[in-house]
UniProtKB/Swiss-Prot annotation:
Location of Phosphoserine modifications: 116, 118, 129, 145, 264, 285, 335, 337, 420, 436, 446, 457, 503, 505, 549, 582, 620
Keyword check for Phosphoprotein: yes
Gene that produces this protein: Phactr4
Phenotype upon gene inactivation: Neural tube and eye defects in embryos followed by death. By 9.25 dpc, mutant embryos show failure to close the cranial neural tube. About 15% of homozygous mutant embryos exhibit severe exencephaly, along with a wavy spinal neural tube and a shortened anterior/posterior body axis, and die around 10.5 dpc. Remaining embryos exhibit complete exencephaly from the forebrain to hindbrain. Most embryos die by 14.5 dpc, but a few survive to birth and die shortly thereafter. Embryos also have eye defects: they display overgrowth of the neural retina and retinal pigment epithelium.
Assembly behavior: Binds PPP1CA and actin.
Protein source organism: Mus musculus (Mouse)
GO CC annotations, alphabetized: cytoplasm; lamellipodium
Domain of life (superkingdom): Eukaryota
RPEL repeat residue numbers: 63-88, 575-600, 613-638
Protein name listed in UniProt: Phosphatase and actin regulator 4
Record's subcellular location: Cytoplasm; Cell projection, Lamellipodium
Sequence ranges of Polar residues compositional bias: 546-559
Keyword match Phosphoprotein: yes
Phosphothreonine modified-residue sites: 425
One Pfam assignment: RPEL
């Protein structure tokens, strides 16, 4: 069995792929330590069996990924079409890296970053991805703290971090190695050309910068990368390196990361802890635009990105939304502290797209795997923006989506609500249902307005869930078009609507993203426990809601019947009892039949005394034997002699069981004396007398 870490460490010798070797320092344990798992796998057979078992899923994922990668267009064609910017400096330097990165494991890989090479490894083995991403995650975070030397302002203190944007040190390592020769003004451009093979349209990159403000208010100083491969909410944080996230959009799901508190930067550690539940800023990278209220001129390294995005931000807003089909990037309230959301939980299983009742903004970078889709989707979006704008205004302004959209199952919506760290606000209608408590529309996105002349950040709100019995209530409630949404997400409901319709035609762009999402049903392995628990509760709640409550049952059935019929029932019972009692004999009859005794207790006692007296008299007046002989009642023969004898007690002095040996000897002695002297025996038979031994 090949050690996963060996393949992961192959590119470490290259300048662009040296993520694993460069960062094996104090804060991040070296990648070499994973080699012990290979020896363990050779000895411990269940380990080997476990990895073989997961290879089936890996094969399926590989086939899907290769099919999707085959749809990509080569870098040259994208440069010709103007999708990618061509930078001669980067081309010269990246030529050496392309030879290693482009054919990693037979897959075309984004050239611009070492991160893009290791996600491709993740495509090859799901288990390997967990190990590779952890060192990368640590190395990327270390870049944020140590690799920021090219720019003097790149590393603000952790306490000042919320006020300053993330700077180019966050970009992929391959470009950070080159950044030392490239002036700060061209960092954004160099990064975008480095990641050129990821095939992102200019519309996607500019739209990504629109969302960078949102990302920064969420991520704080350092968008800490976490290992979940597909979820890239903060990836678009940089306008021009949004393309570096190609592989993660197709990676198999990875279990939550090992805690990355080893990082030297405390805020990085805090953010990595916040991310480790599954949503990954998988490729948070180069320069983020400045925070609210900070002019772009304050940080020279960000000027190119800021100026580039401000021009086309308004034009490309509508094209951004077609790429919003990934886990939710929630915009916390405008407080500048970075660790506002405690975590970004993993995306829910089976419906990672934009589920009903939730709006999720996710980087365009997600879809660099099929780069040709970006222009097609953007063209479709330009044609379809009218209807989506109306839908988006309604859906963001209203606390619920129009009821014509089929609702997703409650347990999936609960998971998506758990995924978002939005504060729970009390429901508008005042009901205390769990779904309305969990899912409430938040107006905090209105606070998150941007500067630099750009439009507001993309608002992401969690809509109220509807359990089946609430659809009727919502139909009765008038739907008020409260147009409070920003114009940054005009086409967002279009993606939602397309997903809700679940049209499977390959001609529509977002449907291919749905294929990617379907590939990620593997995420159920990590969230199955929560999903099953919520699903069980949801099913039970639905069943119980269909049953009438006890008060209703009592009011509907039993009391109404009893009021009218209880008297009749009582009469029937009474008549039956009366009829049975009437058949009983009267007291006189019972007395005559000696069944019922007379009630007079004195008479009864007198009768008893009379009976006793008669019996006593009869016994006391018994005649003697002489009287009976005289009255001829007793007749004896002549030879019978009647003698008077005194009464004696035949009982012994003590019971025979209590006789001692001395008592027995005395009895024998007395008996012998009687037989020898007192007992009259015929002389001829005297010798037959038997005596007891003394």
């Amino acid at each position: 069995m090949e050690d996963p870490s060996e393949e992961a460490e192959q590119p470490s010798g290259d300048p662009g792929m040296g993520m694993d070797s460069v960062e094996a320092g104090d804060t991040t344990p070296p990648t070499k330590r994973k080699s012990k798992f290979s020896a363990l796998g050779k000895i411990f057979k269940p380990w080997k069996w476990r990895k073989k078992k997961s290879s089936d899923k890996f094969k399926e994922t590989s086939e899907v990924l290769e099919r999707k990668i085959s749809m990509r267009k080569p870098r040259e064609e994208l440069v010709k079409r103007g999708v990618l910017l061509e930078d001669p400096e980067q081309d010269g330097e990246d030529s050496g890296k392309l030879s290693h990165a482009a054919l990693k494991n037979g897959h075309t890989t984004p050239i611009g970053s070492a991160r893009s090479s290791s996600p491709v490894l993740v495509e090859e083995e799901p288990e390997r991805s967990l190990r590779n991403l952890t060192p990368e995650e640590e190395s990327k975070k270390r870049l944020g703290s140590t690799g920021s030397q090219p720019n003097s302002e790149a590393e603000p203190g952790p306490e000042h971090a919320p006020k300053q944007p993330l700077l180019p040190p966050k970009r992929p390592l391959s470009s950070s190695c080159e950044a030392k020769e490239v002036p700060a003004g061209s960092t954004a451009r160099s990064v975008s050309s480095t990641s050129g093979s990821t095939t992102v349209t200019s519309a996607a990159t500019t739209a990504a910068t629109d969302m960078t403000k949102t990302v920064k208010s969420f991520v704080g100083p350092t968008p800490a990368p976490a290992p979940a491969p597909r979820t890239l909410p903060a990836a678009p944080a940089s306008a021009n390196t949004a393309a570096t996230t190609t592989a993660p959009a197709k990676q198999p799901p990875i279990p939550p990361p090992k805690p990355a508190q080893r990082n030297s930067n405390p805020i990085i550690a805090e953010l990595s802890q916040a991310m480790n539940s599954g949503t990954v800023l998988s490729k948070p990278s180069p320069p983020l635009p400045p925070k609210r209220g900070i002019p772009s001129t304050s940080i020279p390294s960000l000027e190119p990105a800021a100026s580039f995005t401000t021009k086309t931000a308004n034009d490309q807003r509508e094209k951004t939304v077609s790429l919003c089909l990934e886990p939710p990037l929630i915009i916390p309230p405008s407080s500048p502290s970075p660790p506002l959301p405690t975590h970004i939980p993993p995306e829910p299983p089976r419906s990672p797209l934009v589920p009903a009742k939730t709006f999720q903004i996710v980087p365009e970078v997600e879809f660099s795997s099929s780069s040709d889709l970006f222009q097609d989707i953007s063209q479709q979006e330009d044609q379809k923006t009218e209807v989506p704008k109306k839908i988006q205004d309604q859906s963001f302004g209203e606390s619920h989506i129009p009821s014509r959209l089929p609702p997703l199952p409650l347990h999936i919506r609960i998971q998506q609500a758990l995924t978002s760290p939005l504060p729970v606000t009390p429901p508008l209608e005042g009901t205390h249902r769990a779904h309305s408590l969990l899912f409430e529309n938040s107006d905090s996105f209105s606070e998150d307005t941007g500067t630099l002349g750009r439009t507001r950040s993309l608002p992401i709100t969690i809509e109220m869930l509807k359990v089946p019995d609430d659809e009727e209530e919502e139909q009765t409630c008038p739907f008020v078009e409260d147009v409070t949404s920003t114009s940054a997400t005009p086409s967002l409901p279009l993606c939602l609507r397309e997903e809700e319709k679940e049209s499977d035609s390959d001609s529509e762009g977002p449907i291919k993203y749905r294929d990617e999402e379907e590939d990620d049903d593997d995420d159920e392995s990590h969230q199955s426990a929560l999903a099953n628990r919520v699903k069980r509760k949801d099913t039970l709640a639905m069943k119980l809601s269909s049953r009438p409550s006890e008060p209703e049952t009592n009011l509907n059935s039993w009391p109404r019947k009893s009021k009218e019929e209880w008297n009749e029932i009582r009469h029937q019972i009474g008549n039956t009892l009366i009829r049975r009692l009437s058949q009983r004999p009267t007291a006189e009859e019972l007395e005559q039949r000696n069944i019922l005794q007379p009630k007079n207790e004195a008479d009864r006692q007198a009768e008893k005394r009379e009976i006793k007296r008669r019996l006593t008299r009869k016994l006391s007046q018994r005649p003697t034997v002489a009287e009976l002989l005289a009255r001829k009642i007793l007749r004896f023969n002549e030879y019978v002699e009647v003698t008077d004898a005194h009464d004696y007690d035949r009982r012994a002095d003590k019971p025979w069981t209590k006789l001692t040996p001395a008592d027995k000897a005395a009895i024998r002695k007395e008996l012998n004396e009687f037989k020898s002297s007192e007992m009259e025996v015929h002389v001829d038979s005297k010798h037959f007398t038997r005596y007891h031994r003394p």
